[in-house]
Amino acid sequence: MVTSSDQIQNGSEEQSKRSEIYTYEAPWQIYAMNWSIRRDKKYRLAITSLIEQYPNRVEIVQLDESNGEIRSDPNLCFEHPYPPTKTSFIPDKECQRPDLLATSSDFLRLWRISDDESRVELKSCLSSDKNSEFSGPITSFDWNEAEPRRIGTSSIDTTCTIWDIEREVVDTQLIAHDKEVYDIAWGGVGVFASVSEDGSVRVFDLRDKEHSTIIYESGEPSTPLVRLSWNKQDPRYMATVIMGSAKIVVLDIRFPALPVVELQRHQASVNAIAWAPHSSSHICSAGDDSQALIWDISSMGQHVEGGLDPILAYTAGAEVEQLQWSSSQPDWVAIAFSNKLQILRV
C-alpha cells in the first residue's frame, strides 16, 4: 500500500526510475484532463480550468523525459468559453488522422493542433440545436475508438447525441433518460450506454434506436448516477458511480439489476473511475478522500469476507477531481487535484 510518498511501491526495482511521480502546477484549478493517444506523443496531456469567469483555459502539456519536468507550451494554450466538462484527444494511436482535441461545455468543440505544433485552431463548434444561440450544457462525451468519426455527447436536456464529426452533422439524437444525462460511454461501434439524474444505466444500440435496455437502477428515488466507464477489454462489464457515494458499482450487462461487486474502500465521494486499457480485471478510482485506488476484480465472482481491498493506493494532496489511465502507456495513470496534475507509474 502506498501513501503520499515519492514512489508507488509495486515490488519491481527494475521498473523504478528516478521518480515514479511527476507533478505539474497550473495557474488555476484543474477540472477536465486527458492523455494523448498517439504513439508519438505518449507523455502529452490536455488540462482545462475551472474558473467562474467566462473565459476559461486549456493547456496542452508534455513530460520532458530528460529532466522529469512537465512543461506547458504557450503556443498550445488557448481560451475556452465556460469550464470544459471533459476533454479528449482523438483515438488515433497510429497517427493516421489530424491531431484533434475535443472539449465539451455549451457546445462540442473540436480543436486542431498544427503538424508543427505551433498553434491550436478551432476546427468545429457543434450544436444539435441550430435554432438557438444557446445550447443545453453538455455534461460529458465519449469518442468512439472503433470509429473515430463518431462522438457521443450527453446533455442536461435528457438527450444523447451521436455526431459525425467529419461531416459535422448529427447522426442520431435520442431522448435517453427522464432527467439530465451525466455521462456516456461507447461499448463498441454502434453500442453506447449512459447514466442519469434518474438513477439508471441504459444501453442503446444504434441499429434499434426505439429501444434501450436498463442495466441498473440505483434503487433509491432521486439518487443520480454521475459517472460511467465501460470495460474496453471485456465489454460485458461496466462501472458506475452514485452521486455523493463512496462506492463503485461494477455491473455485468448479461445480468441486469444486480451489481457483480461493489468496491467500498473510499472514505468520501468517488469522483472518477477508469478501467485499465490493457487488462480486463483492473479498474482505478479516485475521490474526495484524496485517494486514487487500483482494484483487481478478477475474484469478483467469489465471496470475499468484508469486500475487496485495492491492490494499490496513492494519497494525493487534496480531493481528486479527475483520473485518466493512459491507453498508449498502460503503466501510467494521471490524476488532477486542486491546481495540480500528477502522472503516476503504476
UniProtKB/Swiss-Prot annotation:
Task: Write the record's keywords in alphabetical order, separated by commas.
Answer: Acetylation, Biological rhythms, Repeat, Sensory transduction, WD repeat
The highest taxon in the source lineage is Eukaryota
Gene this protein is translated from: LWD2
**Does this entry carry the keyword Signal?**
no
Following inactivation of the gene, the phenotype reported is: Plants lacking LWD2 do not show obvious phenotypic alterations. Plants lacking both LWD1 and LWD2 are early flowering and this phenotype is more prominent under short-day conditions.
Q: Which SMART domains match?
A: WD40 (SM00320)
N-acetylmethionine: modified positions: 1
WD repeat boundaries on the chain: 79-121, 133-173, 176-214, 265-305
Query: Which conditions up-regulate this protein?
Result: Circadian-regulation. Up-regulated y virus infection.
Q: Which SUPFAM superfamilies match?
A: WD40 repeat-like
Q: Name one GO biological process term.
A: rhythmic process
> Which positions form S-S bridges?
none
Q: What is the organism of origin for this protein?
A: Arabidopsis thaliana (Mouse-ear cress)
Q: What is this protein called?
A: WD repeat-containing protein LWD2
Pfam families the UniProt entry points to: WD40
Q: Is the Nucleotidyltransferase keyword given for this protein?
A: no
> Briefly, what is this protein's role?
Clock protein essential for the proper expression phase and period length of both the oscillator and output genes known to participate in photoperiod sensing. Required for the expression of APRR9, APRR7, and APRR5. Regulated by APRR9 and APRR7 at the transcriptional level, indicating the existence of a positive feedback loop within the circadian clock.
